[in-house]
Amino acid sequence: MDKERKLIIAGNWKMNKTVAEALDLVRGLKLELASVKEVDIVVCPPFTALSEVSKAILDSNIRLGAQNMSENNVGAFTGEIAAVMLKEFSVRYVILGHSERRQYQKESDALILKKALAVHAASLKPIVCVGETLSEREGGQMETVLQTQITGSLAGLTKDQMEETIV
């Protein structure tokens, strides 16, 4: 029997907010959203703010997410971050396959699948993004592009992993 999923609202702050600005924002969110129970609330600040935001939301209904993660656990991967590192900040969710990373960093569905498997191996929850470009939409390719991304990004996941994956 399929279990009913709780709705989730996730905010990706992208490359916005200094640590001080992130703390101001999350303190305001804590006050405004304190009574919200029917949805899971996730904030995904820049990596530089993860530590402080993690501390600021400890006693709240807000959960922490990361904007990306390496498929590797350790090694000479300059500028990357591993799941074990994210867990030190109490990160619970990781955004994967965002359109900007697909476009500018040329991330493939195969790479996103590897990242999703690494996220699951760390007992975190992946938020796998899919989406077509404007030219693909205007060219009538939306459904094909989305199907290809979904299939390619999730093809190696188990049923249990799929149930923990947000698309």
Where are these regions (language model features)?
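Active-site loop-to-helix "anion-binding N-cap" substructures in soluble metabolic enzymes
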Residues: 1-167
